[in-house]
């Protein structure tokens, strides 16, 4: 390959501000500015073969009919979170793989799997070989709870648990012990709801999905009958969407187990809520009203609000999780900006498993690429990677 002086680009900003489709113009402008002084066709390297990487490749290929795109991926197979992060009972979300496959089969796009950039090849070497390097390698690390006991057996990150039932190679030996009645999930986003749904779904439903065989066997033997989804703020700040909440409500042989006191005074705020938030809140309030006192179903799930983890409590053997201690919070402010403030009161919940779904973070990929450890991001200006002095580093971009 001819050596061409290149750079790194940060497309994360472009995707966040413009959206997947709106990024087309920004990418087109970027490609037009590629240095062509060598007289060769522009060559772009994309590090990371997940959704952000393939959307970037797709738009680059549309922007110019002479650009060549190489996609490097640490795993042997492409598509990242679409393949290993989407719930197995949501096949419609995975349909985008068909589009990504067409992109991967494009005559000017080349996929290179099982290549660990930063180890097998450095970013500096890539910058010498390409006009531009796009960093879209995702967030592969878990955010820690930072509480005593989180290293006990029976405590998992949602990322690892999802990877386990979806067949992510690094999680296939996770082997969670489902020989307990209650599971506590920390976090109230869609990933938390996905995990809760998989734990409580009837086996006949799961057998129709592409869930891994080892996960299906473990869930067949599972004794889990109750899942509590805990959040540090209130019902008006749930991060999950109405579709996922409705799926939980409609799950066969399962009933909602909510605390009516959590919704006190909420009805007075409905008229001022944005429509999506209003619909979700009305659905929750209706569920609380309809299911009050109804615990006849075999399995139960519910939200617990205004609670933050303080400590994972060990069980009788001192080695496994046996419960979790939660700080009781109150809200200061209102709406999306409301902050959870501890009241000083504590509450213990008995459980045999704790799953943390409080988000992921990126890791540094290469010593030559600047990285802000506090925010776990690559510093960038409108997608262009910045050095430690805040100056642009050539044509390096971030995405995803």
Q: Where would I find each of the regions flagged by the language model?
A:
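N-terminal mitochondrial targeting presequence
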Residues: 1-41
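Feature captures the FAD/FMN-dependent oxidoreductase FAD-binding
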Residues: 45, 99-155, 302, 310-325
């Amino acid at each position: 390959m001819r050596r061409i002086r290149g750079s790194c680009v940060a497309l994360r900003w472009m995707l966040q501000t413009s959206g997947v489709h709106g990024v087309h113009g920004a990418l087109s402008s970027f490609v037009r500015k590629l240095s062509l002084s060598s007289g060769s066709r522009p060559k772009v390297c994309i590090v990371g073969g997940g959704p952000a990487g393939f959307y970037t490749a797709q738009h680059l290929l549309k922007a110019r009919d002479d650009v060549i795109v190489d996609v490097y991926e640490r795993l042997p197979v492409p598509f990242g979170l679409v393949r290993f992060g989407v719930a197995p009972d949501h096949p419609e979300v995975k349909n985008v793989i068909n589009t990504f496959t067409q992109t991967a089969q494009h005559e000017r796009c080349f996929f290179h799997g099982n290549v660990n950039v930063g180890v097998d090849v450095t970013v500096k070497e890539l910058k010498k070989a390409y006009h531009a390097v796009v960093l879209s390698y995702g967030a592969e690390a878990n955010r820690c709870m930072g509480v005593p006991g989180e290293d006990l057996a029976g405590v998992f990150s949602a990322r690892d648990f999802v990877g386990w039932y979806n067949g992510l190679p690094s999680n296939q030996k996770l082997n969670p012990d489902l020989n307990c009645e209650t599971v506590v999930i920390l976090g109230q986003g869609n990933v938390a709801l996905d995990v809760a749904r998989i734990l409580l779904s009837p086996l006949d439903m799961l057998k129709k999905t592409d869930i891994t065989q080892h996960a299906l066997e473990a869930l067949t033997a599972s004794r889990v009958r109750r899942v509590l989804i805990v959040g540090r703020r209130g019902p008006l700040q749930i991060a999950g969407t109405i579709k996922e909440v409705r799926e939980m409500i409609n799950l066969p042989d399962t009933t909602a187990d909510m605390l009516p006191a959590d919704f006190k005074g909420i009805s007075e705020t409905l008229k001022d809520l944005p429509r999506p938030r209003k619909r979700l809140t009305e659905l929750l309030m209706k569920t609380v009203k309809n299911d009050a006192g109804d615990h006849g179903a075999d399995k139960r799930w519910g939200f617990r609000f205004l609670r933050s983890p303080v400590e994972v409590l060990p069980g009788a053997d001192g080695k496994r999780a046996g419960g979790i201690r939660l700080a009781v919070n109150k809200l200061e402010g209102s709406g999306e900006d409301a902050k959870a403030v501890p009241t000083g009161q504590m509450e213990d919940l008995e459980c045999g498993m704790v799953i943390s779904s409080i988000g992921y973070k990126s890791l540094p990929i290469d010593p030559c690429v600047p990285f802000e450890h506090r925010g776990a991001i690559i510093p960038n200006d409108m997608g262009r990677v910045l050095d430690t002095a805040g100056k642009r580093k050539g044509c390096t971009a971030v995405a995803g």
